Regions:
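Contiguous mid-protein beta-loop-alpha structural module that forms a pocket-lining wall or clamp
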Residues: 1-55, 60
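Short acidic-glycine-tyrosine-enriched beta hairpin
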Residues: 2-11, 135-159
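A generic structural signal for well-ordered coil/turn residues at beta-strand boundaries
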Residues: 6, 102-104, 121, 149
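Conserved hydrophobic/aromatic beta-strand scaffold that supports enzyme active sites
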Residues: 9, 17, 26, 105-107, ...
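Ligand-binding loop in jelly-roll beta-barrel domains
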Residues: 16-35, 144, 148, 156-184
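Glycine- and acidic-residue-biased ligand/ion/polar-headgroup-sensing regions
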Residues: 23, 110-142, 148-150
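C-terminal amphipathic alpha-helical segment
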Residues: 37-119
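Intrinsically disordered, low-complexity coil segments
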Residues: 48-55, 97, 136-143, 167-174
Length: 184
């Protein structure tokens, strides 16, 4: 077992055996989360159809990278966070994914309206701290919309600049979003 806490970032490249454990909320950021998952065990959980979710021990065992020991995981995959910017208004952290992944992730902490740029990629974001925020277009290309804690939202690349503002019960409080983009 590897202890984790809220906002830890765990990199899980293909072939790494893992499970979330009890009482954990997991935000999985992946290009193919269900296509290539080989479940070795699923704790008796059922799918939307009410039937046990499939496990595939034989195929899964062929996918395991057996050199990924507990020590290797602790040294290489746990919370490799780098602070890119830290001002009174904004903290930006590169949380990254494993170097083999083509997705880049950054976490943003702020307590007032903050401008973002799509950086020539579709943006997938999730509100990971705070109760709600409003997403607005700088140029009016879309109607403002409110997102709530743990909700995921997408901003198309063609939008360019957009703003995120804490609102409602999060107004004037620090919130955080994690943003995933395709590395260019």
């Amino acid at each position: 077992k590897i202890p984790i806490k809220k906002h830890d970032h765990v990199l899980i490249p293909a072939g790494t055996i893992h499970c979330s454990g009890s009482d954990a909320m997991v935000l999985e950021i992946s290009a193919t989360p269900y296509i290539f998952t080989m479940k070795l065990w699923d704790w008796g959980r059922v799918g939307l159809d009410g039937k046990p979710r499939p496990v595939n021990i034989e195929r899964g065992s062929h996918s395991i990278q057996y050199d990924r020991t507990t020590k290797w995981v602790k040294d290489n995959l746990i919370s490799d966070i780098k602070v890119l910017e830290d001002t009174k208004d904004l903290k930006v952290e590169k949380t990254g994914l494993h170097e083999l992944e083509f997705i880049e992730t950054k976490r943003y902490w702020f307590d007032k309206k903050t401008t973002f740029n799509t950086e020539e990629s579709v943006n997938m974001l999730n509100l990971i701290e705070g109760e709600e925020a409003v997403i607005t277009s700088v140029d009016g290309s879309f109607e403002p919309y409110v997102v709530h804690y743990a909700e995921t939202f997408i901003v198309p690349e063609c939008v360019g600049e957009y703003e995120i503002t804490p609102c409602g019960r999060s107004e004037n409080k620090q919130i955080a979003v994690i943003k995933a983009t395709v590395q260019v």
